[in-house]
Design a protein with these regions (language model features):
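Long, charge-rich boundary regions
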Residues: 237-239
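Cysteine-cluster motifs in flexible loop/terminal segments that predominantly coordinate metals
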Residues: 191-233
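Charged, amphipathic alpha-helical stretches
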Residues: 1-64
Length: 239
């Protein structure tokens, strides 16, 4: 069962026309990581991504399929960090390919959550990240010092991908940064909501709650995601 493949495919289709740069992942490129949350005061900031009423979206799609190749890379849609001069719309999307999700259904669910939680282990120097899991928003406040020291999406992306290397069975990561104002950020926000809905549905299924398909609130997802209905009925039967 590939929970996120439809969203992953739609994301690639939507953003392909906006790609401005692609960089192969090199761990030597990684921007310094402080290992803890950093405070960037307003008086020290250059600008914010996803702040001050601008869209700010983040989500992670995991697949075992071949829609992603085996090369990890950072992909930019829009201007790079040194080129941005004011608060900007922003999205950061991780497309993760693994060779397999191992173990029981519960084990596989935990592996999906682990991939989604990698973002909480990345602390680029000179960046204050504020992530809201409830709304799938991400805001990034950049310091002027980081801009002066040469921060870029290529280097920040390498920092993120380095953190993903701890995932079991990892094949590749496509780390997308989006800053082009012409991108449909509402569509990306809807995709983020869809990712979270699938994770929530899988969690509900694994709890073993019995259900009547005709009245179940997850019926649209079961209709859309191949294998989800069978998994749901199996766990309801075993509850």
């Amino acid at each position: 069962m590939e929970l996120f493949d439809a969203i992953l495919s739609d994301t690639i289709t939507q953003l392909n026309p906006f790609i401005t740069h692609r960089w192969s992942y090199d761990p030597a490129d990684a921007w310094p990581d402080t290992g803890k949350s950093e405070l960037v005061l307003q008086r020290d900031m250059a600008y914010e991504l996803g702040g001050e009423g601008c869209p700010g979206v983040q989500y992670c799609c995991v697949t075992t399929g071949s829609a992603l190749d085996e090369m990890s890379e950072i992909i930019l849609c829009g201007p790079d960090l040194p080129e941005i001069k004011e608060n900007s719309a922003y999205a950061r999307i991780a497309l993760v390919r693994v060779s397999a999700l191992d173990g029981t259904d519960d084990d596989q669910y935990r592996q999906l959550c682990e991939a989604a939680f990698v973002k909480y282990r990345v602390f680029p120097k000179g960046c204050m990240l504020r992530i809201s899991p409830e709304s799938n928003r991400e805001q990034v406040r950049l310091s002027r010092q980081a801009i002066q020291e040469g921060i870029s999406f290529r280097r920040v992306g390498a920092d993120f991908i380095r953190a993903y290397q701890t995932l079991p069975n990892l094949v590749s990561v496509k780390l997308l940064f989006v800053t082009d104002p012409a991108v449909d950020y509402e569509a990306l926000a809807n995709a983020a909501t869809g990712v979270q809905a699938r994770l929530n549905a899988l969690n509900t299924i694994l709890s073993g709650l019995a259900t009547d398909c005709a009245s179940c609130q997850m019926k649209p997802l079961c209709d859309e995601v191949e294998g989800m209905r069978e998994l749901h009925l199996q766990h309801a039967k075993n509850a």
